[in-house]
């Protein structure tokens, strides 16, 4: 049975995470505009849309790896841009590329995240057990299969507690059993007051999730053109 750390283990208590009238621009192309959301403790957002609609860009924006061209993000009513370090400590961004160091053993990779969060070896043990990785603990990252790397990357969700999970295509390379483990982990995280934003092309069970269809926020070309003219001026 998976038992992730409860809300008392979070570095910061969950609060309402919100975005208001967000505009995302990459290069000279507006990806989405006028996007707003409100995510309360225990909540989930499911991002849907065709390729190029901005699902990955939105997740990176929520992690402050990108900045909105307009609009703002708040945590508990306070602008997250005012303290990027604090926001980095309250969220896990798991991208579609696995952050596995090839020369480190699997356990060392997971322990790296636990150490950053101030968590101990018990968290690492639980993470490896949850994703059936304990037998592979001493295997170097470069020798892991795609599915094993993905499970190792997701194991940090248990090894390093954080209230906000931002998951980009988390089911990639996972078999049905591992997807079930992830679904259970997300459910327990939400029950403890945690929040999750998920982008996926595969079926994943997220009871009560708010669906955010990115193609509904396709930008008004005139608004994007106006932004570029202002920049040139």
Curated annotation (Swiss-Prot):
Its main location: membrane. It is a peripheral membrane protein. Belongs to the ABC transporter superfamily. CcmA exporter (TC 3.A.1.107) family. It holds the Pfam family ABC_tran. Keywords: ATP-binding, Cell inner membrane, Cell membrane, Cytochrome c-type biogenesis, Membrane, Nucleotide-binding, Translocase, Transport. The complex is composed of two ATP-binding proteins (CcmA) and two transmembrane proteins (CcmB). Residues 17-233 form the ABC transporter domain. It is found in: Cell inner membrane. It catalyses: heme b(in) + ATP + H2O = heme b(out) + ADP + phosphate + H(+). SMART domains: AAA (SM00382). It is an enzyme of class 7 (translocase). ATP binds at residues 49-56. Its EC number is 7.6.2.5. This is Cytochrome c biogenesis ATP-binding export protein CcmA. It comes from the Bacteria. GO terms for molecular function: ABC-type heme transporter activity; ATP binding; ATP hydrolysis activity. Part of the ABC transporter complex CcmAB involved in the biogenesis of c-type cytochromes; once thought to export heme, this seems not to be the case, but its exact role is uncertain. Responsible for energy coupling to the transport system. GO terms for biological process: cytochrome complex assembly. One of its GO terms (cellular component) is plasma membrane. The keyword Mitochondrion does not apply. The keyword Nucleotide-binding applies.
